[in-house]
Regions:
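Beta-sandwich interaction modules
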Residues: 71, 113-125, 136
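Extended, low-complexity, turn-rich repeat/linker tracts enriched in Gly/Pro/Ser/Thr and Asp/Glu
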Residues: 85-92, 139-141
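Hydrophobic beta-strand segments within beta-rich accessory/binding domains
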Residues: 68-72, 77-85, 130-133
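C-terminal edge strands of extracellular/lumenal beta-sandwich accessory domains
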Residues: 20-49, 125-154
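Non-catalytic, beta-strand-enriched accessory regions in extracellular/secretory proteins
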Residues: 52-74, 119
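Short, surface-exposed beta-strand/strand-loop-strand elements in extracellular ectodomains
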Residues: 88-103
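Short beta-strand segments within Ig-like beta-sandwich modules, predominantly Fibronectin type-III
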Residues: 60-61, 108-113
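Bacterial Sec-dependent N-terminal signal peptides
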Residues: 1-22
Length: 154
């Protein structure tokens, strides 16, 4: 499973890096359109579904520094969690936390310096997980952008 996820994400990220600049032209004059981030997500969604993965959560929103979301994950599954930014975002990260004795502890993170982040996790137990999306750097003249978050498994 991890190997399959690895190859899926390699294909996904190479496609996104090549096409990122093209998505800027889809935005409106005010820079508020969701079209660029949705266009960026489309090839990934198609690839995920062609490879028989199931998307169990999709989220698209505006972000300046960080957003947090929660999801119950199950120990019987290995999950891929992908966060990606639109043309304005230069560095986005994702971190997954598990609740241990009432406190959130870091389970896995991707802190690479690029506009997409991915982790593959297999929870130790069924339970709620905290997913934190953080933006550390924007492209010149931007301080806000849209992000996409996808959670998937086989």
């Amino acid at each position: 499973m991890k190997l399959k996820l690895f190859f899926l994400f390699i294909l996904f990220f190479s496609t996104l890096a090549f096409a990122q600049r093209e998505y800027a032209r889809l935005d409106n004059d005010r820079g508020t359109s969701m079209e660029p981030i949705l266009a960026r997500a489309e090839p990934l969604i198609e690839e995920i579904e062609e490879d028989d993965f199931e998307i169990v959560r999709m989220e698209f929103d505006i972000i300046s520094t960080e957003k947090v979301t929660y999801r119950k994950l199950y120990k019987d599954w290995t999950y891929g969690i992908v966060a990606f930014g639109d043309y304005r975002i230069k560095d986005i990260d994702v971190a997954v936390y598990e609740k241990v004795r009432g406190k959130w502890e870091l389970f896995e993170k991707d802190a690479e310096n690029d506009d997409e982040a991915m982790v593959s996790i297999k929870p130790y137990k069924d339970g709620e997980h905290k997913i934190e999306i953080s933006v550390f750097k924007y492209n010149k003249d931007y301080y806000v952008g849209h992000y996409g978050l996808l959670i998937l498994h086989e």
